[in-house]
C-alpha cells in the first residue's frame, strides 16, 4: 500500500508539468496545410539537453539537420559552427529564455529523474565515426580533417586526434547537434597540411559505457599540386594542337575542287 501511495505521489508531482508538453500530445492533430507546389517545408531545431555526465548541459540549433550554432554556457554566448554564421551568433536577445530552459532541465533531472530510475528503459547508441577532408585533397596545401560522429545517444563523448599514433593538440571544440528521432551527431575539426605519408586517427569515446570508435584517414586519389598543374597544362596544350590539326584538315578538304565525271 505504501509503495502504491509513493507512486501516486510521484505522479501528482508531475501533473503541473503537463502544460509543458507539446500541444500535439494534448489535442487532435491539425490538418496538414496545403502549400503551393513551389514551396518547401524546412525544419529549425532548437534543442536544449541536460544529463548526469559531461557535458552536463548543451544547446544546439540546426536548420534541416545542418548545425548552425551551439551555446557556450560558461560564456553565455552562441558559438557558430562555421565563420559565415558569426554575425548571426551575436544576437543574444533570447539569452534569458535559454538560461531558464537550462535551469528547468537541471531541475527535471534532480527532481523527477530519481523517481523514474528503473522504470524507463535506458537507451544507448554506439557511436559511428568517419573522417574526411573539408576540401579536395592536394598535398602541401592547408586543409581540414572532419571527424563526423553519428548514432550518438546520449551525447556524452570525448574526441581525440592522433597522427602516426601520437596525440595531436590544437584541434577545435566538438560540436554536438540534435537530429530527428531524438538522437545526436557530433563534428570535430583538425587543421593540417596533408603529406603523402600521413596517417590520422579520430578516437571517439562514449563516456557512458567507455565504448570507443576509431576512424582512420590516409591520403587517397590525390596528386601533388605541381604535378596536377603540369598535367592540366599538358592536356590543354594537347587539345589545342589537336584542334588546330583538325581545323587545317577540314579547310583543305572543303577547298579541294570536286572532280568531274
Swiss-Prot record:
Residues 27-124 are annotated as: Alpha-1. It is found in: Late endosome membrane; Lysosome membrane. CDD domains: IgC1_MHC_II_alpha_HLA-DM (cd21009). One of its GO terms (cellular component) is membrane. Disulfide bonds join 50-105, 147-202. Changing residue 151 to A/R: Abrogates the interaction with MHCII and peptide exchange. It is a single-pass type I membrane protein. Changing residue 181 to A: In allele DMA*01:03. Residues 125-217 are annotated as: Alpha-2. Keywords: Adaptive immunity, Disulfide bond, Endosome, Glycoprotein, Immunity, Lysosome, Membrane, MHC II, Signal, Transmembrane, Transmembrane helix. GO terms for biological process: adaptive immune response; antigen processing and presentation of exogenous peptide antigen via MHC class II; peptide antigen assembly with MHC class II protein complex; positive regulation of immune response; positive regulation of T cell activation. Residues 121-215 form the Ig-like C1-type domain. InterPro entries: Ig-like_dom (IPR007110), Ig-like_dom_sf (IPR036179), Ig-like_fold (IPR013783), Ig/MHC_CS (IPR003006), Ig_C1-set (IPR003597), MHC/Immunoglobulin (IPR050160), MHC_I/II-like_Ag-recog (IPR011162), MHC_II_a/b_N (IPR014745). Residues 1-26 form the signal peptide. Residues 218-233 are annotated as: Connecting peptide. Pfam families: C1-set, MHC_II_alpha. Gene3D superfamilies: Class II Histocompatibility Antigen, M Beta Chain, Chain B, domain 1, Immunoglobulins. Residues 27-233 are lumenal. GO terms for molecular function: MHC class II protein complex binding; peptide antigen binding. Residues 255-261 are cytoplasmic. The chain crosses the membrane at residues 234-254. Glycans are attached at residue 41. Belongs to the MHC class II family. Heterodimer of an alpha chain (DMA) and a beta chain (DMB). Interacts with MHCII; this interaction mediates rapid selection of high-affinity peptides in a pH-dependent manner, with an optimum at pH 5.5. Plays a critical role in catalyzing the release of class II-associated invariant chain peptide (CLIP) from newly synthesized MHC class II molecules and freeing the peptide binding site for acquisition of antigenic peptides. In B-cells, the interaction between HLA-DM and MHC class II molecules is regulated by HLA-DO. This is HLA class II histocompatibility antigen, DM alpha chain. It comes from Homo sapiens. The gene is HLA-DMA.
